[in-house]
Amino acid sequence: VNIIIQIFSGVQKTGYISVRGSDLMNFKKALQAFLVTISCGMLNVAGAQQRPVFIPEDYVTEQAQADFVANGPKLLFSDSPETVYRNGILYRDKVEGDVRLFLHHVNGVTGKKKLAVMLKNTDNLRPVHYKVTRSGAAGFAYDYMRDGKNSQKEYFDDSSQKPQEGKLGFGGSRELLSGRGIILPTDKLYTATVDLHFDKPVEVSVLMCETKSDLELFNEAAAIQPMDEHPLRGTFEAADWNYTLKKPVNAPEKPLMLELATSQEGYAKGVDATTGLPAENYGNYGVIYKVNFTVAGKKPVSFILNPIGGPFAGYGVLENKTKGERQLLALPERTVCLGSKIEEAIELAQLKAGEYSFIWSPPGASNLPVQLIWEKTE
């Protein structure tokens, strides 16, 4: 893969081959698709405990009945334009309390750009106190699915968390991602999920600018950029979606299935604060799903993740509440991704009697929806 990238870069620099803009874009898309295919077959974890399984399209299941509650932080979602060609404000809103920021942007121009998230106290004479309670970020690979997966690994891994806090005086600003922004080379992605708390209203701005731009001045003067053809930005209430199965799972004769991040389930609805227009989070990116269930009986139950929308690469957490255990799970662990074939699925665990929670979130650059399946073991 690295050889292919080096050859491609060499062609651009030497000029021995004339490449039209449309051909170049098509090549990039083909290269990305090739990298996804390769990634779904590359080993990345030794001694994996998961087991690949195959779920045919005509697989017969029973719909799991679950109670649903949405609560938790307000979500700021910035993913359109996904590939950024012009400097400007990509998303902006004023928020307070518990907030989750999900951003996903690619530098689409030749040369480096700076991606930044600015926090500004615009209204409060008293200082605004803020805290970063959890975060995960990744980027800089041509394989965007790997970036999405690594970002989630960091977000869900308790040991990688480094809580931060600070304050903003009246009119004061601070850059959130690194203190100076993130320098993005051409065609590179940066994706992040950040949980925050503000004790007073704060203006949050996601922006792209020149590498040497003064961030505070740019944040004041820059124009808000329009979305691309995919309407994926906005502000959404209650970004934690909780499901609790109504009945214990007891070696079911017919497998139980719960489908998530699907149009039938419905997506989070909110407002694009830059325009005031209604917004819908197609895919529920940035939403944290928690599925609570009880396993009963003497026989273990097979717990399966089945991505049915295409290649999928993420992380999640399996909690055994009976034993007080929390396990970080690569989804999948043997390869970067799975789901390049519709029958591909993974058995995450064989679960004995007890109370469990499975926590996950739709990863950036992955395909949806997914199914959770509980079936009896052989």
How would you describe each model-predicted region?
Residues 33-42:
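Bacterial N-terminal signal peptides
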Residues 51-92, 229-266:
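A eukaryote-biased signal for short, well-structured alpha-helical docking elements
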Residues 108-116, 188-192, 285-291, 354:
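Short, solvent-exposed loop/turn segments enriched in Ser/Thr/Gly
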Residues 148-185, 328-353:
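Intrinsically disordered, low-complexity Pro/Gly/Ser/Thr-rich segments with frequent PxxP/GP/PP motifs
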Residues 126-147, 303-313:
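Short acidic, flexible loop segments centered on an aromatic residue
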Residues 51-54, 295-378:
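C-terminal functional regions that serve as terminal interaction/effector modules
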Residues 183-219, 368-376:
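Terminal connector regions
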Residues 105-111, 118-127, 196-198, 295-297, ...:
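Asparagine-centered strand-capping/turn motif at beta-strand->loop junctions
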